[in-house]
Amino acid sequence: MCGIVGAVAQRDVAEILVEGLRRLEYRGYDSAGVAVVDSQSNLTRIRRLGKVQELADAVDQAEVVGGTGIAHTRWATHGEPSEINAHPHQSGDISVVHNGIIENHETLRELLQSRGYVFESQTDTEVIAHLVEWELRTAASLLEAVQKTVKQLEGAYGTVVLDRNDPSRIVVARSGSPIVIGFGVGENFLASDQLALLNVTRRFMYLEEGDVAEITRREVAVYDASGERVEREIAESNAEHDAGDKGQYRHFMQKEIYEQPTALINTMEGRITADSVVTEAIGVNAAEILSKVEHVQIVACGTSYNAGMTARYWFEDIAGVSCDVEIASEFRYRKFVTRPNSLLITLSQSGETADTLAALRLAKEKGYMAAMTICNVAGSSLVRESDFAFMTRAGVEIGVASTKAFTTQLAALLMLVTALGKQQGRISKEKEKEIVEALHALPKQINAALSFEKDIEALATDFADKHHTLFLGRGEFYPIAMEASLKLKEISYIHAEAYAAGELKHGPLALIDADMPVVVVAPSNDLLEKLKSNVEEVRARGGLLYVFADADAGFEGDETMKIITMPHVSEITAAIYYTIPMQLLSYYVALIKGTDVDQPRNLAKAVTVE
């Protein structure tokens, strides 16, 4: 993985390909490359280790021409980051780019070596190039050669193949890794993310599992896994064309932190009235399904898992329905027991997270009453394969460290919890109104919280030279502490851990000293007094405390305990609200340290491999 772009056009496509890669930089990568062929079958391949700009400079210098091409940004999975491991890979006249992991690549490599093929790279992708080259010797067309090749592959792939001897077409295959086709006028495109193509088209088609497509300037022909030609829906995208522009902000992450009030308003629009949740707006047949739910199983990864952990408290406290939350990569390999009338909920910003998708597909075989997804990308695999989808409307999120996707997931989950309790008669009209009013107030409250930016920036200097940080919370604020620790480690590279505050005495207290910052999330709720006792445990051992506390919480600071006073907000939405200062803290610590905030090392935005 990480990003794919392709084009078949009458005009030169090198600039389109490179611009597409720029738009996919947010996904994370270590190298980039293009292969372009002209009408005379002259092929140019250029690969570079490092940023897309280095590739762009090389393409400009080489004056690359040609109307058919493929391009790729790589995030290393097999083989170290290097120019020789960068895509496109070649075998004779065949060029290939690929996202995913070919699990049987070692067996295929041995087979191909026995046929006389010599491998130049350490990647699993090169086996695809050699297999296509081999199959093309006897196949009637490139399409047939690719169809024969993919039947030999085990694992996940979104792969695009170009034959220099047939510059009029490219062939793409998809299994477990997303591919979207863009339709132009006398030209067609493909990518792993529609954002790459928004500057050239607004009409898109998503390939389904097992599809193989042949793309020319005039036509897109799609074939399913059985080889039958099929039609796939073409839809107009309303995604923002300029989503890749930072505007006045220094980083995309900063921009996206500030976009949260608007993202929340958009997510709530049409789903809540002045005093109630509109259950029908949650999804097709949502009211009927929710009325029967006896158990909720949430499956997610990373930040989305933390959102699910927060919502578990809401499902049980507000709706009175038991809820389990599991990391997708663990869920799919566990021999779990499906409870009666259990609703599966997957959470994902991209809708393409490989482990979450695999968990959904497994769950469909295990007797869940329905599968729902809460997702930010319309047309993504999770949305298409779930029984119903609740879209978060956060807008395109570029920064690898998720911000607005997290808070909009929480808002969506709170609306879902309220609808569930309402359908089952477990919450009163008064309680529903209280929740809805708290949600309506939230965007304005978050706008106010963003005004603390300068204070938090000053606070961040205390963390920049530290190697470890501890985050503490209780109840639904324990997952908020988990999310805060994840953000800090992701973008500042400071080792950070989160604990339920009551667990301090069971081990983490051994870590406390004057060099260990301890961040405490302390709203005013029925666990506050317990939390104060935990704070005193740290204080008694010389720990350095930073307490984000409700104005009514009654904390008093001193030289070892700094109090960051937060305005009082509803207990119902406080978990969402307290996320904002945690995001700002992580951002400014990373800024002071000089790390790559938007593209932290070793990480990718959409994890489409296991």
From Swiss-Prot:
SIS domain mapped to chain residues: 286-426, 459-600
Pfam families: GATase_6, SIS
Catalytic activity: D-fructose 6-phosphate + L-glutamine = D-glucosamine 6-phosphate + L-glutamate
Catalytic residues (positions): 2, 605
All residue ranges annotated as the Glutamine amidotransferase type-2 domain in the record: 2-218
GO biological process: carbohydrate metabolic process; fructose 6-phosphate metabolic process; protein N-linked glycosylation; UDP-N-acetylglucosamine metabolic process
Enzyme class, first EC level, given as a word: transferase
Keywords of this entry: Aminotransferase, Cytoplasm, Glutamine amidotransferase, Repeat, Transferase
Listed GO CC annotations: cytosol
Superkingdom as given in the UniProt entry: Bacteria
Transmembrane segments: none
CDD domains: GFAT (cd00714), SIS_GlmS_GlmD_1 (cd05008), SIS_GlmS_GlmD_2 (cd05009)
Protein name (Swiss-Prot/TrEMBL): Glutamine--fructose-6-phosphate aminotransferase [isomerizing]
UniProt source species: Vibrio vulnificus (strain CMCP6)
